[in-house]
Amino acid sequence: MGEYIMIVSTKGNNEITKLLNDWYLEIRSRRIGNAHQLKEIIDSKIHSIEEDQNLLLYYSLLDFRYQFVIDNLSVSKSSFDKVEAFDMPTDNFLAYYYHFFKGIHASTIGEYQIAKESYENAEKLLDCIPDELEKAEFYYKVGAFHYDIYQGLLSYKKVSEAREIFAQHAGYEINVAFCDNLIGLACTHLREWELAEEYFTKAMDMFQKIDEEQFILMVRQNLGLMYATQNLSPLAIRYLSEVNQKMPNNYKALFIEAREHMKEGNHSVAKDLIAKGYSVCEEVENIEYLHHFKILDAMNGDFPAEALERTVLEGVSYFKEQELFEYIKEYEEYLATAFYKENKHVKASHYFYSCSQAGKKAIEKEALK
C-alpha cells in the first residue's frame, strides 16, 4: 500500500515522478530527515521538467506540504500562491491533492469556510486514491480541521479512524503518535482531562524515542493549553514559556502564555508576549489570531468597556463569517461583564443575551450530524 504512481508521468520523466512519489511518502510519514534529503535531490533535477505542467504542479503541491510539515507556523496567506498559479488540474489524483492541500492551507490561515469547501471537494475524489494510508492522512487532517473550529466530538471520531488505519501499518508509528496528540487536544476541548493527559503522554513517549524536538515541543504546548483550560496558570506558563523560548514565532503558544500571565496579574509580561505574537501574525497575515491578540491586548490593558466593545465587535464579525461561535460567546461574555461592572446595564444585558445565543449555536455545531 502507498507505493503506487500517483499521477501519469510524461514519457522520460519517470525518474522525477518516482522521486516525487517517494518524497510524499516521507513527508506523510513525518520522516523529516529523509524528506529533506529527497527534496535536495529533486531540486537538483527539477529544471529538466520545465515543459511538464502536471509534474511541476505536483512538485509545487508537495513543496507546500513539505514546508507545512517542517514549520506550519510560518504558513502565510501567500504560501499557496505557487500552486494557484497553475490551471486547475483535471487529473483526478492532482485534483485531490490540490483540494486537500488547499484545505490545509485555508485552515491554517483562519479561512475556515474555504477550508470546509476544499475538504469536501477532496473527499469526493478520495475514492480515486487506491491507498488506505492516504485515507488515514485525510481523516487525520479533517479531524484537525474539526478541532480548529471547535467540533471536538467530530475531531475525536475522525482522528480515531485515522489512528486505527495507521496502527495497522509498520513504519507509521510517528503518525499514530500525531493522532494521539490530536486526540489529546479533542479530549481537552471536551474537558476530559485525564484522557487528554493519557493521550499526550503516549505521543510524548514516541516523540522522545525518536528524539524529534519539534514534535516534543508541540506536545508540551498542548499540555500547557490543557493546564490553561483548567485555570492552572503557573503550570501552563511553565510549559509554554519553554516552548516560546525555543519557538519564538509560535503565535498560538504566545497567545496562551500571554493570557495566563494576564490571569495571574502579570500585565507587563503579558503585554510583551502580545506584542510579539501580534507581530508574527502580521507577518504571516493570520487574521484569526490578529483578532485574538487585539482583544487580549484590550483585556490586558483594562480598557473601558466601550473601547473594548469596538475591538471585540471587529473580531465578532470575522468569527461570525467563520462560524466560530465559541469565541463569540467567550468574548461577548467578557464584554457583558465589563459593562455590568460600569453599571451600564442595558449594554450588559444585550451582550449577556447575545453570548447565550452564540453558546446555543456552538452547542448545535458541536453535535454529531
Task: Locate predicted features.
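Tandem amphipathic alpha-helical repeat scaffolds
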Residues: 19-30, 60-71, 96-110, 137-150, ...
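Loop-centered beta-sheet repeat module
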Residues: 156, 160-226
